[in-house]
Regions:
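Primarily NTPase-proximal linker/entry elements flanking Walker-type ATP/GTP-binding cores
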Residues: 31, 35-166, 173-193, 201-209, ...
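Short glycine-rich anion-binding loops that position phosphate/pyrophosphate groups of nucleotides
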Residues: 221-223
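Short beta-alpha junctions and helix-cap segments that line functional grooves
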Residues: 18, 119-121, 150, 266-268, ...
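Conserved catalytic-core segment of NTP-binding enzymes
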Residues: 176, 196-211, 225-331
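N-terminal accessory targeting/assembly segments
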Residues: 9-46
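Short hydrophobic/aromatic residue motifs in ordered secondary structure
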Residues: 74-76, 170, 286, 314
């Protein structure tokens, strides 16, 4: 059995040459990743305004259906429709050809209200070292993979990264994190199966602090079916972290699978009831037409989307930019 606080960093890293293959232009990756969502929305919008020259009640009813079936969510859809109704009432006449641009503007405004910044130039705060990110989410959403990709990108930016395997209930979770640690070339702190997750978090932060780390990413169990147990576990992890670093965690990031649409929204609501969430990472947007869920989740939770996953590659986890997201979604070919 591995002893407490053991590193599972291999001295023999995997071939790092593969990463060069994924070094694509970020905007191209975003456009490609949102292609299915964009095509679906455009097709539905075309049907919504078919035979109409101006935006009227029928068009708005059709638009409501377009947004709901694009996984924007009912409450957020009604909010967008209300804003467009107000513009129609104010301007008296809006042609259907203007609808695309108006919709883009309203969605961008909505994302701005929810603190979803244009994160193009986001930097680690200089006064928080190490910067600690507690990562939560149910199993299967791409949580550990997201941690691995973040570790890669932070390391590539010249940061010293530590990973903590605090999902001690699943051997596969620890093994997967260790594989990512080897692949990226960063240490992973782990304990034996069934250990106290808070103890793993303590060891990880202690080691990271002692070794001058810049970033710490802590993986956690996603046992949402046991809400009270999960709530207590996350509270204990946070309390123990503060014994090492009083400001920790700096960020609690919820990872959601965008391809599940409204299920992701339900998970987000349930996790928000369990612990305070400060940022969202929405994965698997490249293989789905359900990208509208990004808009609804951000609006309803009032939590900023920070990262979006647009493919399998290391570079395909991007900092979220509301401006680029909306531009890609509504860009006419």
């Amino acid at each position: 059995m591995p002893h407490a606080g053991r590193h599972c960093l291999s001295t023999k890293y995997r071939d790092m040459g593969i990463f060069g293959f994924f070094n694509k232009n970020k905007k191209e990756t975003l456009d490609k990743g949102l292609e299915k969502t964009k095509t679906s929305v455009f097709d539905k919008l075309a049907r919504a305004v078919a035979g109409k020259s101006k935006v009227d009640d029928d068009v708005l009813d059709n638009l409501e259906e377009v947004l709901i079936t694009s996984d924007v969510g009912v409450d957020t859809t009604l909010k967008i429709i209300k804003r467009i109704e107000e513009r129609v009432a104010r301007d008296k006449y809006i042609s259907t050809s203007e609808l695309n641009g108006i919709l883009r503007d309203e969605i961008a405004a909505l994302l701005a209200e929810n603190n979803s910044d244009d994160n193009d130039n986001w930097e680690l705060p200089a006064d928080h070292s190490p910067y600690v990110i507690l990562v939560v989410g149910v199993n299967g959403v791409g949580k550990t993979t997201t941690i691995g990709k973040l570790a890669y990108q932070f390391k590539k930016a010249g940061k010293k990264v530590y990973l903590g395997a605090a999902d001690t209930f699943r051997a596969a979770a620890v093994e997967q994190l260790c594989i990512w640690g080897e692949r990226v070339g960063v240490p992973v702190i782990k304990q034996q199966m069934g250990s106290d997750p808070a103890s793993v978090a303590f060891d990880t932060l202690s080691s990271a602090k002692a070794n001058g780390a810049d970033v710490v990413l802590i993986d956690t169990a996603g046992r949402l079916h046991n809400k009270v147990g999960l709530m207590n576990e996350l509270k204990k992890i946070k309390d123990v972290m503060k014994k090492v670093l009083p400001q920790a965690p700096d960020e609690v990031m919820l990872v959601l699978d965008g391809s599940t649409g409204q299920n992701a929204f339900e998970q987000a609501k349930q996790f928000s009831a369990v612990t305070q969430i400060s940022s969202l990472a929405i994965t698997k947007l490249d293989g789905t037409a359900k990208g509208g869920v990004v808009i609804g989740i951000s609006d309803q939770l009032k939590v900023p989307v920070k990262y979006i996953g647009l493919g399998e590659g290391m570079e395909d986890l991007q900092l979220f930019s509301k401006r680029q997201f909306v531009d890609s979604l509504f860009k006419k070919d």
